[in-house]
């Protein structure tokens, strides 16, 4: 049996949710091998998620749209990385860029382990003519399998990340505030994963108007025009879209929330990293493909189990073949009831 490597390069560039899913696997591995050095290369945006890091983990932000753009950028990156004298590469991405980097390291006789994404299984489970419907390996297990190929295992359990920042004064809970704080992240990258905005607005407004809840809405400045109008409807709605809080402050805020309502999205994963309960709404995609957040189960998911057409997509990027996204015909009342049940279950 070959000895375990001492200096490991870990590659996972994107997407944000997938990079977030690396943390519950990589952190325990790093802490189980304090004598070894780990370096993760990822996108500048995703690098901001890596807080409360193990001391032997270095996170390098690699901008593939600027200095590391294209084929030339891959060679530039390799020339820089080879100076670090890594003795193993864990490719958690398996796309053209990571394949090329891995190949260049192989030419230098560096040991490489690559993720099996289960692409064939995922195509089968989302096919109209699927012959089986079962839980596939989670991304967490697929990441762990890569480290296992390098002889790196751990029995350590992942613990939620420590709050990375102090909240600004206007986000501090006052002594007289007895409301339950709820987060809402109403967007994901693809239409097939987005709960209709009119329905989500009903959810947010109905919760806020009870006076029992304060609702914080997460989104980008591009979402502000829509979400700021929600804020104007009820006093207990706070839109964070134009606040420029940054990931660290948003992650710190999540630790103060009773629950986060999300899509199958990066915010689902970020909330679970902070140990915050989640209610996640799934449409075209399905937890069986392996992307459910850390520690979540079917009780955290709202979905249309009666539809045989779903999942029709692994990532939610395929247009609905019926044109109506019937998978998102989920009533606001059902979402509200599940949120209240989650909060009551927490406070009992």
Residue map of PLM features:
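Catalytic machinery of carbohydrate-active enzymes
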Residues: 1-348
